[in-house]
Each structure stands twice: as structure tokens, then as C-alpha cells.
């Protein structure tokens, strides 16, 4: 019984260290066996260990890395966002409705878009629409929007073809809002609408003075790429009046930027845009839709803060701030309250997907015995030896800092003297091994309670951390981690009761030094290393990369010709059964070669030619078979 209590207490500390409760929104957790689980059902029934899903996939000959999608989580996110706005509307007694418009750029995968639309299939009144930002996306949503509310919002730069396609959408029975991003688009829309005999539905994107903070702050503000200034907005009104087309302007749109961490920035932007809406109404524009764009954030690190990886508000608070602000401004102006639209793609999709892969090897520092330098070793190395003796024989906290600084200085000098030929390779090897042992002991003896020790401990933690080589490409599967330093929760899937054993950093298998994760969720902050159970080469060691359902797979690139991973759709049944409903196999080597226009048929001919010329006849078939197997195989590592 006592062991059970101790185990539970230990796991509670581990759960706190990984901050799982806060970033997971209840969809993921650590069970009492130290296993990561998923709980995707709306009734919260059944906690399914992720490692069991991997075992079922292996039985189907599907190896990691694999992206696992949970459509039940997508359904829950749709309902949660809509419910938050519906609650805010009811509380405020707001006399209009809310629409959740999904911008498919966030994740255009068919399995994702179909499930989002299916989430409201049984509802008589649907609160879903779709957004397109390009011609290809528009052509996709024109065939899908009838499964939602038939509302389509068209953003992005537009040419004649784009505009004609949007207008054709009206003929297909959709409500297509063509959002003007620049003045020249207005002439195109009016001309093509007349040509097709269609009354257009126009929207106008406002370039606000308000600007958020964070990685995407350039999306808002007066220098933003998109949107019309106040004077340009008035020019649009004047032109529409002149053409007797003012009633075609039906929507006001703004976008402060993705991942808005501070609710005050959201409120300020909504307030400014709501005043644009009311001013345009007073000028005679019959605008009835108010589109707040994206920005609803994800709490990637679980700190509920204003950091760019977090958010200092919840769903209900977000909805209340928008509804209340729009309502209050409309009351001030005595204008009708519009339909509210949000384009909350990141919040909708991020939680539903997990990338799972395996650790294929590690590099671990193991303390070695420090040997006394030989008599002919230089004075510099003897200085390092004295530092080790002082540390080994015991010293006070202040001296620990001095030993650290001396060792840093001595090691730098060793590298300098080796580069100029003063020291030998043997000298350098001794110095590096001795310094590592000194660092190891300093890390053990220093305390986080001493504020002067803390920055040194951070440095030592990085220096001594295990290197975990994980079978994935950061550039393909987590491009935002590399490109904009986005933090994603990363956890081992098993053995978490021993998570404090080691600290590690995750490295991918690309031939690029940037292929490393530099920041990890750890308690109430971000650390440069991750607490992990020790690696055992005799047992599979699985890592999970969470909250990767938004943007990552569509932004991923083909560095080193690593392609898309396998992806699967998993639903959890009423009895807790794991239903693998769809498997999309990842790219083969041949797929990737063809993508970069390598003639694979010629490759095969070259193989045959080389084999026939260079390989003994009895080996030729075997060699050709292995080469062919390589072409048809997964781009990731499989054979261990």
C-alpha cells in the first residue's frame, strides 16, 4: 500500500514537471502505470495508452514515425469553441449568432477537413463555414461547404480567375464573401460579377492601428501586409455608392495575427474594428457580418501566461471579450449587432494530432575516473588537476563557482593551444575528459536554491544532457520548432515513473545541426533539456510530439528527402476498443525522388548497368533486390 502511495506521489510530480494537465486540455495524460494516454471521447470514457496504438500499427506492418489523428478531439474542439460563443451570446443577450469558419490553410488534409465538417452533420442549424486563401483552396472548399453552413470566406490576393471562381460559388448555392485586401480587387469583382450575372457579397479587410505581440505581430498594425487603410475604406464606400452597389458590402474583417497570447490585445483589436463596422453602417453600408479572423491561441507550454507559447485566457473568456466588446460598441452607436465570425483554425486542430517516433540511439556521459596528469604535462593541465582535487576534497558553495569559471577558462585555453600546435591530441583528450568530470560533480553539488548557481546549473544541464537521436525530421514534422522557435510538448510514452532519471535533448536524423529541439515544456516554464527515463537499448523507446495538428504537416519540407510520415486515423469505441479507421502510408524513397524530378526509371537502368559491370553474377540478383527495396521503402529508418 505504501509503495502505491509513493508511486502515485511520484507520478503526480512527474505530471507537474511535464505540465500535462494544462497544455493537454484533458485529451492527454499520464496514467498510474507511467504511460502516456489519450482520452478523445466527449464522455471522457477510456484512457488509451499511446504505446498500445503503436503496437496495433506494428501488427499491421506500419512502423514509426507515424502521425496519429484523433477525429473525436476535432469534434470536441468544434463544439467547445461554438459552445463558448453561444454561452457568451446568451449571457450578454446578444441578438445574433456566431459562426466558426475553418481556414483550411491550417491543415488541408482531407481527413481533417472532413471530420471538422462531420462534427455538426447531425445538427439542424450549423455553425461552421470554410475559409480559402488561394485558388487551390477555393476550388477545394467549393466542393465541401454544402456540408456546413455554406458560408465561404475568400481571403488572400486575387486575380480574375480566383474572383470568377468565388462568384461561381454563389451560383452553386454558397454564401461566398470576397474579402477585399487591396483596392484593385474591387474593379475586378464588379466587372466579373456583371459578366456572370451574379450579385457579389463583399467583405473588407481593415488595416488596424491595434497590434498584438508575439511571433505573428506583423499580421496586424499599420504596416501589415494585408488590409485597407481608413482612407481606402472610404474610397471603397464612395465607389460602391457610385455603382449603386453599396448593399453588396456585407462583412468587415480584421486579423491581428495567429497565437494572440494576451486577451487585452484581442479586446483592443475587436474594439477598433467594431467602430469601423459601426462607422460604415452610419455611411449606409448594410454590413451584417463581423469577422474577427484568427488569433485564438493554444497554451503550448501550459503556463497560462502572455508568452508567445501560451495564452492568458480561456475559451469562454475569449468569446465573452469579443461578444461583449462588439455588443457594447454597437450599443454606443445604436447600430444592430452583427453575426460574429472567428477563423480559429489553430485552436480547432492543434490538439488532435500526435507524432510518435522511436529513439534509435543515445549519446550519454558516464563519469570516468580522473587520472593524475603525467609529469611532462603542461602547467595548464596541472591547473585543471588542482581544480579537480579541490572539488573532490570538498569545498564551499562560493568556491564551486570559482572552480567552474577556472575550468571554463582552462578548457578554452587548451583548445586554443591545441589549434596552434602547443598541445597534443593526448593533452586535449585528457583536458576534455577531466573538465566533463568536474562539470558532472559541480552539477551534483550546486543547488538551485542558490541564485548564483542557477545560471551555471542551466549551462551544466545542457552540457551533460543525454543526446537522444529520434527517427524523424524536424524540418518535415515540426517546422515551426526550427523556423520560429515554437515550443511543442515532447514526452516519452512509457516509463514516466522514472522520468527524473536523466535529462536529454532530442535530435533528428537529418544531416543538419539545426535538426534539434532547443526548448522543452518543464513545469511552469521552458527549459533547454527534458527530464526522461534512462534509455535501454534492449527495449523500444517511444517519444510523443504533441499539439502538432495545426500547420506542421502542411509547412513541412523535404530536407534530406525525408518525406511525409505515415498517418493514421484512430477512434476509440464505446468499449474502449482502438479502431484504426484509415491508414495513409508515408512517402517512399521513389516518391521523394520523383518529387524533385529525378528520373527513377533511369536510376533503375543505371543500377542494372553498374551491377552487371561490377558485381559477380551470383550476387547480382541480391544486390538489385536490395536496391529496389530501398527505392520502394520508407524514407525513415526501419532496420535496426
UniProtKB/Swiss-Prot annotation:
Recorded catalytic activity of this chain's protein: L-arginine + H(+) = agmatine + CO2
Residues holding substrate: 290-300
Q: Does the keyword Hydrolase apply?
A: no
Give its E.C. classification number. 4.1.1.19
A single GO BP: putrescine biosynthetic process from arginine
Q: Which CDD domains match?
A: PLPDE_III_ADC (cd06830)
- What does this chain do? Catalyzes the biosynthesis of agmatine from arginine.
The name under which this protein is listed is Biosynthetic arginine decarboxylase
The record lists the organism as: Vibrio vulnificus (strain YJ016)
Q: Which gene encodes it?
A: speA
